[in-house]
Amino acid sequence: MTSSLVGSEMCIRDSFMDPEPEFTRWAKETGADRIELYTEGYAAAYGTALEDDILQPYVDSALLCDELALGVNAGHDLSLDNLEKLLTACGNIQEVSIGHALTVEALQFGFAETIRRYNELLDRVAAKPRVFPQE
């Protein structure tokens, strides 16, 4: 887990972490405004039989953030393929980091088309009810 906890009116304090409840609670105790969920595990499991089991801790972390009044960001290996399910399941994600996938998708589809596809995906997610799958 890494943390950037520099407080000021112009700086959001966040902690980059795995979806572990104790890390989320620690972030709140140290004064973070948000957490950023490290999504490599979810991205690696996407499209496999483990997908839903791996997704559940992210959902649980998002729910805990609601309880603790923490914002939620997410990032690492997110793409057009896997982003919609994550955003739908964790309805309170405020920001995502799309890095390498955006470059690869832009080479594949063109930059304008890739951005259009992300905007379309975000519109679909915004039109859905907030869903937090529970066991």
What role is predicted for each listed range?
Residues G47, E51, E105-K128:
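C-terminal helical cap(s) of enzyme catalytic domains, especially alpha/beta-barrels
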Residues F23, I54-S61, N82-L86, T114-Y118:
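A general structural detector for well-ordered alpha-helical segments in enzyme core domains, enriched
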Residues E20-T30, L78-I93:
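Catalytic cores of alpha/beta
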Residues D14-C65:
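Histidine/lysine/aspartate-rich catalytic loop segments that bind and position anionic ligands
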Residues I35-Y46, N92-F111:
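Glycine-rich phosphate-binding active-site loops on the catalytic face of alpha/beta enzymes
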Residues F16, I54, G75-H76, L107:
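Glycine- and other small-residue-rich loops at beta-strand/loop junctions that grip anionic moieties
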Residues I12-F16, D33-E36, G71-N73, I93-S97:
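Structural preference for beta-strand elements that scaffold enzyme active sites
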Residues M1-G7, C11-I12:
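Single conserved hydrophobic/aromatic residue that forms the stacking wall/gate
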